[in-house]
Amino acid sequence: MKAFTQHHGLVAPLDRANVDTDQIIPKQFLKSIKRTGFGPNLFDEWRYLDVGQPYQDNSKRPLNPDFVLNHERYQGASVLLARENFGCGSSREHAPWALEEYGFCAIIAPSYADIFFNNSFKNGLLPIILSEEDVDQLFKQVEASPGYQLSIDLQAQTVTRPDGKVLSFEIDAFRKHCLLNGLDDIGLTLMDAEAIAGFESRHRASQPWLFRD
């Protein structure tokens, strides 16, 4: 997993509350067991005017001109600004996969569904919680200022607006450590690789009948 320390990027505003995981990545695209290939179908039912199908050539599909991610001013956005209860619905891990592959490094919202919140951290996507008042102000500023960018500092736990105002956010210490060091579940396990190998060696020596060479 790629480490997250600091990020400065363009903000895209998704002004909808209770965005569920089926809206983030519709169910018909969940057949793949790989974690790649979901970015083109992020918010599929909102981004396109037709009904998307797995393995379809998305470059030929008609775009919805009213959807925010299709607006020219938000092309290349890497910070998603959202409303409350983002990521509600089913527990599909494909949702943070799709967001990350599209290009988002962080999400800012007043609240998240618990499972989506946890899955995001495990996949290197930083879900930041700010107050509704701060989020409201960000929506207004993004709308009024094309090219609006934010600076995120995970170590300092801050979001800095273009006007210099600093917004602080809370994060669990263990999750922060994992993001700063790029550690997912596999990475955490590999930190104990030497101890695991030692146990396996001792176990094999003490109970050799359990093993087939």
Curated annotation (Swiss-Prot):
Transmembrane segments: none
Pathways per UniProt: Amino-acid biosynthesis; L-leucine biosynthesis; L-leucine from 3-methyl-2-oxobutanoate: step 2/4
Entry-linked InterPro entries: 3-IsopropMal_deHydase_ssu, Aconitase/3IPM_dehydase_swvl, AconitaseA/IPMdHydase_ssu_swvl, IPMI_Swivel, LeuD
Enzyme Commission code(s) on record: 4.2.1.33
Top class in the EC scheme: lyase
CDD domains assigned to the protein according to its UniProt record, in alphabetical order: IPMI_Swivel (cd01577)
UniProtKB keywords: Amino-acid biosynthesis, Branched-chain amino acid biosynthesis, Leucine biosynthesis, Lyase
Entry GO CC: 3-isopropylmalate dehydratase complex
Gene Ontology molecular-function annotations: 3-isopropylmalate dehydratase activity
Top-level taxon: Bacteria
Reaction(s) catalysed (UniProt annotation): (2R,3S)-3-isopropylmalate = (2S)-2-isopropylmalate
Residues in the signal sequence: none
GO biological process: L-leucine biosynthetic process
Family: Belongs to the LeuD family. LeuD type 1 subfamily.
NCBIfam families given in the database record: leuD, PRK01641.1
UniProt function note: Catalyzes the isomerization between 2-isopropylmalate and 3-isopropylmalate, via the formation of 2-isopropylmaleate.
HAMAP family according to UniProt: LeuD_type1
Oligomeric and partner information: Heterodimer of LeuC and LeuD.
Name the record gives this protein: 3-isopropylmalate dehydratase small subunit
Origin species: Pseudomonas syringae pv. syringae (strain B728a)
